[in-house]
């Protein structure tokens, strides 16, 4: 799991808790503190002292693309699951996604449905976007809709490290790094 963190003290404990509850037994968490000015660094150090799967990296604040690419260099697994420090993962997420990629070697990534939270605080426009994302259930759906908007919620994706390296990793072009990656 590759998780960039920037001023994430308010949400980081919940995000990490959801990861350590995964049903997949063998995985690593690479958390990159992107020069946070809040308590993010201390929270990560505390978690790392009691969670052997967590490796914490720190860099000066340069933005999400630089933080992700910095963390990518430390990833050793064949599959990389993306998650942000303000996201939660259902316990079976990693296990199901890894099983899918194992069974489908022709696919470079897999995503999953998402939900907005906390309940009652998700704005109407974002709720409509989430409904649209969750309606894309097949490769054909994604291919048809890819030029409408980014059809894959980045923090829900697991991808093959080899594919990610082959297409040039994450690139900074002034627009969404995930959408840029999907278009390549």
Task: Label each residue range with its predicted role.
Residues 17-26:
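Short, acidic, metal-binding catalytic loop of nucleotide-sugar glycosyltransferases
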Residues 18, 33-42, 84:
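A conserved acidic beta->alpha catalytic loop
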Residues 73, 129-184:
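Conserved nucleotide-sugar donor-binding catalytic segment
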Residues 80:
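Short aromatic/hydrophobic "clamp" motif used to bind/position activated sugar donors
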Residues 92-126:
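Conserved donor NDP-sugar-binding/catalytic core segment of glycosyltransferases
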């Amino acid at each position: 799991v590759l998780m960039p963190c920037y001023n994430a003290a308010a949400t980081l404990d919940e995000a990490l808790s959801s990861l350590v509850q995964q049903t997949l037994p063998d995985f690593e968490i690479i958390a990159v503190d992107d020069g946070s000015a809040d308590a993010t660094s201390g929270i990560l150090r505390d978690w790392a002292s009691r969670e052997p799967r967590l490796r914490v990296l720190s860099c000066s604040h340069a933005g999400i693309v630089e933080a992700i690419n910095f963390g990518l260099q430390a990833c050793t697994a064949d599959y990389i699951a993306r998650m942000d420090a303000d996201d939660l993962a259902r316990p079976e997420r990693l296990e199901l996604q890894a099983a899918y990629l194992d069974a489908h070697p022709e696919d470079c990534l897999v995503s999953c449905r998402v939900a907005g939270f906390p309940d009652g605080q998700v704005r109407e426009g974002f709720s409509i976007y989430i409904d649209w994302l969750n309606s894309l259930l097949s490769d054909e759906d994604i291919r048809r809709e890819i030029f409408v908007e980014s059809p894959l919620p980045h923090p829900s994706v697991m991808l093959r490290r080899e594919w990610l390296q082959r297409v040039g990793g994450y690139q900074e072009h002034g627009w969404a790094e995930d959408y840029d990656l999907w278009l390549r």
